[in-house]
């Protein structure tokens, strides 16, 4: 008697003869004689009593065909065979169609899912082949049936599902001091500890490049200035030794001089030790600048993940007030301002200025001059973004101004917005930690279903919150299932990540599982489309209605509360994410359109609004936007971002950037950035803020590249954006 069925993907499931009955009745229903439930049950019963303990799906279907062909209803056999062949062709056709678009390098939402990936190259094509092949395996083999149904019905989205079988984690804030002080082993080579700024810069690149191959998300350095500062000093001391060697004079005492700053100055009129000191400073600044140039250049040219994607890198800086730390900050800003190559804007690393009162924000602060410079650089090059360490939820009582390692108590962020700080299972820090995986809830679908279920507003909201709780429970259970799968990975699967970079991993042996250390990371539940959800529930979004704002905050606060509860239930660091939604914004919308049709203000565009943002098409002032979006950030502890679109050439108006940072300070906003248009001629390098240009005003060439921020990061060309994000870009309005 059959007990188990072997599915096409290799899974063994319990045999259920009612599935045979249902399949036969479906074939009978399209014949003249119609259904015969007695015959269908008789055939199913005969097959189920075959002298086999298990059979494959194909074997069972062969048996059904034989029984039908040898029975009184041969016309049913023909319908059954035709349907079986049709389903087989459909399965093959779907994969074939997707693969064909990759082969032909077609620009569509499959090949443009990730704007940082070039899917047209051979390596990029291989990545997409693997990605599209893996997702069905995950659906069939790794997801619970109800989770798979929730994904198929567009309620939730599992991010980086193609990496699910690899057991990889999402991202990490690199404790770079470990690499710099102890060296590293990568591939067939190994590096000694850094002794100068150039080596430190290269090791920073190698660390992020190597670990990106072991993870499916981004790489970040939480305290770029603090980590590299000691190597500025080592470089200075090396320059002093060079001077002694060249001149034959003993200038070793200069190595003990405490410098107030590293500023390049003319040597004219200087003599003896004073001249030697300034020359050493000048050389150190020059070498530091070149090291920062090399770092930025490498981050934009060294490919990772099979050779088709540059490292999705971020660096945090701004709070090191030492002379050496300030030198690092100044030269990374100088490098960014000047651009790379022919003066183009560097796409990576995403740079993040740590804004903190008493350190790097107010006129009397020691790094205020560098803060002003950072705003000038951001006005021209989009970066740095701004991280508000003064936000109430970003402050840490352990932070002390005289602590040389105070950066350990400073929140760091990465990429579009990812934030990891609170910790139930270890130190409260960003360093050596990251996200494990995240899943997003489609708030819009829940809102539409509640809208259609009742005309009474109170009843509608009751239904919505009931559905929201169901979706939250589903997402939490799915993330816990993925965690249970991830924790079985062995340390040796992540040779550099788990060699001491991930918090606590240094104690693991190669064949140990990572179970004991990955709980230092976070599991995040995100959301998309709050604005459209509010329109469905009460007819207006939160940017245009106080009532909608009140409800929006109630929804997100409710989500955050439930997610905090999951942390206790599952004993993991669960957090609430304002999902960045690059490819997802269009995917959810496209499917909901098929289900609900075009609903004005809700499904009438090709995208849903990002997380808790005001819709991009809504005209308002920067302050209104800050006032509305700011209160959500305290609930979105897995990450959030505030952005403002500015008009004209921001290059000549860095004060506008400073005013926006002031709004962040005023409205308790955690992380923000400024968007503006930048069009560059690829022939002559001319740059302008003029949008929609067809011809370069300088050389009259037509090879123009438009640079814009897609979610929280830049893309070298909008040609790589998917259709949903391109539609959103067209709808963006200036906030003024």
Where are these regions (language model features)?
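Conserved catalytic cores of very large enzyme subunits
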Residues: 89-90, 95-519, 540-541, 545-705
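Long insertion/accessory domains within large nucleic-acid-processing enzymes
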Residues: 693-736
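A short glycine/serine-rich beta->alpha loop
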Residues: 8-9, 31, 51-52, 428, ...
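Metallocofactor- and cofactor-centric catalytic cores in central/energy metabolism, strongly enriched
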Residues: 286-290, 296-297, 535-536, 722-729
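Contiguous, well-ordered alpha-helical segments that form the cores/surfaces of helical PPI scaffolds
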Residues: 26, 523-536, 557, 709
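Charged, amphipathic alpha-helical regulatory modules used
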Residues: 1-105, 109, 727-733
